[in-house]
């Protein structure tokens, strides 16, 4: 069972970090941002995935997100591609230098998200999936409480 609702002026991506799922080859946004921080596996506009084991367009990619004790790990095709921790000076610096910062000069800036991003990991929340109008398929979605 699900429902989808977009409230004007408050997109879902204002509320939390985003594990970027997209086709690196054919989506222009994958090459925007800085140093690959908008490619598949990234924390959108904040942390680039390294390595980048994404499979080409038309193939299934396996993703996994582990969140435990404010530590977050992203996997792509069973390879760890990044790790970070909420509530640290490093996390704050990432937010401060992203389009979510109150101080951002980016034309895509979202300063409304700043305080929400700094509060991430302090309490349980929601898992959301969004699409920007392009085809996307999901299968075998599992959620396990740690």
Mark where each language-model region is:
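Carbohydrate-interacting regions of secretory-pathway proteins
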Residues: 1-146
């Amino acid at each position: 069972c699900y429902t989808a609702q977009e409230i004007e002026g408050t997109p879902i991506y204002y509320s939390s970090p985003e594990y970027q799922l997209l086709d690196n080859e054919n989506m222009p946004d994958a090459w925007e941002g800085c140093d690959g921080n908008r490619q598949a596996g990234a924390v959108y506009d904040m942390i680039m995935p390294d390595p980048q084991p994404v499979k080409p367009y038309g193939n299934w990619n396996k993703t996994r997100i582990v969140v435990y004790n404010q530590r977050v790990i992203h996997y792509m095709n069973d390879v760890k591609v990044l790790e970070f921790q909420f509530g640290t000076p490093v996390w704050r610096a990432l937010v401060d230098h992203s389009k979510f910062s109150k101080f951002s000069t980016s034309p895509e800036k979202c300063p409304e998200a700043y305080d929400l991003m700094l509060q991430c990991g302090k309490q349980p929340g929601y898992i959301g999936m969004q699409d920007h109008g392009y085809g996307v398929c999901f299968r075998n979605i599992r959620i396990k409480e740690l």
